[in-house]
Amino acid sequence: MRADWIAKRRGQANVSQMHYARSGVVTEEMAFVAARERLEPELVRAEVARGRMVIPANVRHPELEPLAIGITACCKINANIGNSAVTSNIDEELAKLRVCLKYGADTVMDLSTGGDIPQIREAILRASPIPVGTVPIYECLAHVKDVADLTPELMLEIIEAQAAQGVDYMTIHAGVLRDFIPLAAHRITGIVSRGGALMAQWMLANKAENPFFTHFEQICEIFKRYDVTFSLGDGLRPGCLADASDAAQFAELKALGDLTRKAWEHGVQVMVEGPGHVPLDQIPMNMEKERELCSEAPFYVLGPLVTDIAPGYDHITSAIGAAVAAQHGAAMLCYVTPAEHLGLPDIDDVREGIVAYKIAAHAADVARHRPGARDRDDALSRARYAFDWNKQFELSLDPDTARAKHDETLPHEAFKSAEFCSMCGPKFCSMKIHGHLAEAAAAQDAAANGEAEKPAGGLQVLP
């Protein structure tokens, strides 16, 4: 779809959406997302120019259908896929991608850490109409025996290779600084971000500052040539409730704000990653803190989980926090699956995580009164009251599961037009009872109106 749009920009030094927006240009991508979001194109341009909205759209990813991430857009969700050093299967990752597309993930991140990482990423990019993100440090590690052996040159080389391949956004852990490492020492769970832990290990081994930080402007130069969006990683995010909102987390967040503004000087798009594990009552404060420190750059949060006691159900514990975070301004939610803290998610875990987060994002859109956000809810409610079962299935977030649950107890096709379900049966269905009451009330009103109109209507013909 984007091939012709991209061709016009060939040879330009900066092809980022922010660069064009600041030049007063409404790109085709901006016009596309404006129509998609029911926004004016000029508003989209202004939000991208300001840095409050991003459109991750690498010029090497022509298969992409652009979308907007920001406070003025609908809340988006990301799904993570990718193999591990223990399991590596391209077909399985593509199957996961298809599940992501089927159930409505807005973006996908390839977090592969084993096998032929570039080959897996290439397959995902060429099959994905949604933005694809990565964490470059994972591939960097595949080239060395020990994290201490990483060099800034290798890291920049991998980043450039991924950008040239078409990656739309990258998690760069540039805010984990040497001075911040001791701040995490008192924590119950320490540093739980893989990227954050790896960079801390590198800094301690090399007695040097984080190379993502020291070479940040060189990364900006790469990103603006391809229009890669920064997803500034929260390497010091809290990994349990007890560690939430501590000095380490907010020291890094302040550094991420400084880096955000540095990237904007280069005309590069930025979103900022956030926690993690946060008690429910602290979530609004965390959202406000990000807006304040990061100049309103879009906030991309992992959950947050609001309790630590439910392994196997963390798609639920985190979706609760995600809904609150989105209501208070988070622009994108990174899903959590039932396998979180337990193992690599399979296809069923991916589906359950996406559905949980679609619910959270949608609930927040309704709460924030997004234009048209409640249309689907109202349509499904009307179908429910009319006992239009097939319409209810069609409008649901997960039609297959809705239909299967209904058919467990009422499997015959005749029950698709029944005015009851197996919960209440025909005798106790409240909606059916109310329907009869409404009909009776309407008939009574009609009769009363008829009686009232008789004197004004002239002679009454008696039977």
Swiss-Prot record:
InterPro entries: ThiC, ThiC/Bza_core_dom, ThiC/BzaA/B. GO terms for molecular function: 4 iron, 4 sulfur cluster binding; carbon-carbon lyase activity; zinc ion binding. Disulfide bonds: none annotated. This is Phosphomethylpyrimidine synthase. It is an enzyme of class 4 (lyase). Coiled coil: none annotated. Keywords: 4Fe-4S, Iron, Iron-sulfur, Lyase, Metal-binding, S-adenosyl-L-methionine, Thiamine biosynthesis, Zinc. Its EC number is 4.1.99.17. GO terms for cellular component: cytosol.
